[in-house]
Amino acid sequence: VRNPKIFLFDEPLSNLDALLRIKMRLEIKKLQRKMGVTSIFVTHDQVEAMTLADRLAVINNGIIEQLGTPIEIYNNPQSVFVAGFIGSPQMNFIDAELKNNILITDSFTIPNFLSDFNGDVIIGIRPEHLSPSNKGEINITVDLLEQLGSDNIIYGEINGGKEFCYRSPGNIIVNLGDKLTLKIVENQFCVFDKNTSKILN
């Protein structure tokens, strides 16, 4: 009916059931590509944001925390808020101290983290950036298990009760009560200044 220069979408899929939401998400993306009209899509659903956006703005209390492509924001979150919002399951956060280029937590250390900063930090590790290892840094006991076929979402505890999540391939057999030793995939973690919540690495 009209030929606007921009479309504004305000959570158009929020009241749909899961299957219809996926179908409509694909249809919106196809139509947008076909028509070539700039579109602004507001959503609280990070899957919608990641799959629909060419450029993504993560907003916290009216302030843009980060602007970039979905992959840039997933791989290089600039704050604890962004890191926790993008990614499902959510990134794991562990309190630590950075002292003389060594990251020190209650249960493990990470050496050779080159930084001029010394003080309290938060280490962020995505559940998919872990792998089983006899020489791993992180020990968890499986408390909850979500078996999705293609992968397993495994929940346990570290540091005397802090919840921790690990995503494993679906062909790995895991049972409740199993004890797992995990290592962080090389350099696949974030370090945030605890006072400012901003990224250090």
Question: In which residue ranges do the predicted regions lie?
Answer:
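ABC ATPase nucleotide-binding domains
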Residues: 1-81
